[in-house]
């Protein structure tokens, strides 16, 4: 069976969509009989101390195939220089580890962002004379510009040149969002080299039974990153808008650069209807979502975020929760296709709040939208079936017709 070297900065037991995607790709390939070695970093996202809790380390067998580097830079930060130092250190340590690896591989599978990690994949391709599969989970440097992370022209010039090189060096490109297709082809990439494999759900996750609320109090939940791309301060304003509705409370479970800003905003407004919880492992987070009544998702109003689908949308679908969304573009399109919630057209606080009121007052509507989302996920977002896109690439079968049909279908509706 073919041997694969997977290179990823984010991996088990880290929380977040990136690590979850890589873990499941690894597990599915192992089930198919492939020999997979994972080159990754010590878990550090969003912070290293989180993983001192043994509840995050729930599968010891994964570590048997995992080679970890140990960066000295230990903290994610908004500081541009320190963030760049972390990325550069990680890729240099990856390259050193690859240089010492005497094994033979048929494929190198590298996941971005950050695009720096792709440099390790490109090095591995050349050293090992293997084919390179590039997994694109986000568009860098576009997304960094979208959140205002940096705008230094000389850095952007280098980043765009490297991005171009990265796409053109890859033998095959996987995307987890249909919204990435036109952007990548605009860089001169043959559409036949691009395949669509969305973030998906395991059979166990699709078997979680959501709690049924028999009372009159309802919880609106948000989970995941509270960073520059999510605009969670608007959710605080929505909670303020609904503070007279004593039966509606908000629960925020997450981490990120803007968590303290959102928390301080809640305190300043003296809102008693919001509960902030520390990050939890994936299983416990899904259990929290399953026990809630309405799920919330948001992205800042920048063009680059019209191309992405937050992983939490898929998680919300898996436990049959109706969604209220402050999004546009691809995420809006998926929620519309699934008929699993409401997307605010004008993206105002009052519109979002009114959708929550509408759902809170109609139990049958909540149930129907939740069921719609679950059926959409069950039919289209299962790792068990979606991994076949990657398997066909590894077996060098023609995936173009099927994968690109899925990728492009919504653009022609």
Give a label for each model feature.
Residues 1-61, 172, 242-244, 406-413:
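N-terminal subdomain of nucleotide-sugar transferases
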Residues 92-95, 99, 116-119, 123-127, ...:
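Membrane-proximal helix-turn-helix segments that form the acceptor-binding/catalytic region
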Residues 337-338, 342-349, 358-364:
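Conserved acidic donor-binding segment of nucleotide-sugar-dependent glycosyltransferases
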Residues 5, 213-230, 235-240, 251:
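Conserved donor-binding/catalytic core segment of Leloir-type glycosyltransferases
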Residues 253-254, 259-287:
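Nucleotide-activated donor-binding/catalytic signature segment of Leloir-type glycosyltransferases, i.e.
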Residues 351, 358, 365-379:
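A short, well-ordered alpha-helix in the C-terminal region of glycosyltransferases
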Residues 179, 200:
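Carbohydrate-associated surface elements
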Residues 294-297, 315-326:
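Short hydrophobic beta-strand element within catalytic cores of glycosyltransferases
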